């Protein structure tokens, strides 16, 4: 069901980009070292580190206002245990960009979504909120390089305990306009 909803949203964005004067682009970001901390209601606190990769589609709806969808893949390893876990995330985002010069720009994005955390044989769903702030250099009208800071917060209401997580990382990426 979730897969059908995501595919439908992506197809709607593609249809809108073909039907109007707006602009459609693909954005990919990577962080080789991401830090995350998890606090569990029972008082336990865990720190982890790993990589973060995001890919998504953006649609320019007005001036520099964009809407988009991101899919992220994170692999974290607990610092205190010999255990790693995989996080797959889906976020709907709204962003705004501004130009400093013809080639240099800034951008800010805010997103809401769902993170699915796979720890050993268990899967956990976490509601997530994220903010990205950064900028970039426009090589051509269609190709840009970006760098920025991505901060994410998640909350999970589990069967045994509630947990919150906080992640921060430096993202390097590219935008390709279609």
Language model features by range: what are they?
Residues 18-79, 165-178:
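Short glycine/proline- and aromatic-enriched beta-strand/turn motifs that initiate or cap beta-hairpins
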Residues 21, 60-64, 99-103, 138-144:
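Outer-membrane beta-barrel channels and translocator barrels
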Residues 1-25:
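Cleavable N-terminal export/targeting peptides
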Residues 81-105:
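Helix-adjacent hinge/juxtasegments
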Residues 31-41, 72-81, 99-101, 113-121, ...:
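Sequence/structural signature of outer-membrane beta-barrel proteins
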Residues 119-162:
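A charged, solvent-exposed segment within the mature domains of Sec-exported extracytoplasmic proteins
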Residues 30-32, 53-59, 71-73, 90-96, ...:
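Residues on the lipid-exposed face of transmembrane beta-strands in outer-membrane beta-barrel proteins
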